[in-house]
Regions:
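Conserved phosphate- and dinucleotide-binding cores of soluble alpha/beta proteins
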Residues: 9, 15, 27-32
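Acidic, His- and aromatic-enriched active-site or binding-groove loops in soluble protein domains
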Residues: 16-20
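A conserved mid-domain beta-alpha-beta active-site/ligand-binding segment of alpha/beta enzyme cores
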Residues: 23
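Asparagine-biased alpha-helical interface segments
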Residues: 29-148
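Single conserved hydrophobic/aromatic residue that forms the stacking wall/gate
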Residues: 1-13
């Protein structure tokens, strides 16, 4: 199923629809009609499903924070990045990893961060991290270790 999703199978499309509609529909037309916080929570639920299926001890999470745009990486025509690269982050805890990346954006000296912060705040982006933490998927606390 994981391999099939990588090549754009019907199963992958159905699963994306369920995430975007908070499992309230199987119709593509309904993808962007769900309550936004419910959509963010469904992303955390999907993460939990993968973690439970694969096994938490078998996953390492990596975030490559480069060419940071205000748009989702799933957008076919994203806005040009306004913020420079802030690094590559890795952890066995997906919640602390995402929290570290969010904090890195806020703490950056890059003046281009303003647009990204506005987008994260106006879309309540931190809610996925909050929901994942509430599901017990990890901790929002972390120790940042810089390498190199």
């Amino acid at each position: 199923e994981i391999c099939a999703c990588l090549v754009g199978s019907e199963m992958c499309i159905r699963d994306r629809i369920w995430i975007h509609t908070s499992a309230s529909s199987e119709r593509f037309e309904d993808v962007f009609t769900a309550d936004h916080d419910s959509f963010l929570e469904s992303m955390a639920d999907a993460d939990k499903s993968v973690m439970d299926f694969v096994g938490r001890s078998r996953i390492v999470y990596i975030n490559v924070a480069n060419r940071l745009s205000v748009d989702c990486d799933c957008d076919a025509h994203p806005h040009d990045p306004e913020m420079g690269d802030i690094g590559i982050f890795a952890s066995t805890d997906p919640v602390s990893l995402d929290q570290a990346c969010v904090d890195a954006v806020y703490n950056s000296l890059d003046t281009g961060k303003a647009a990204l912060i506005e987008r994260m705040e106006s879309r309540h982006g931190i809610h996925t991290v909050e929901a994942a933490h509430a599901l017990g998927l990890g901790s929002r606390d972390y120790d940042l270790v810089k390498i190199g």
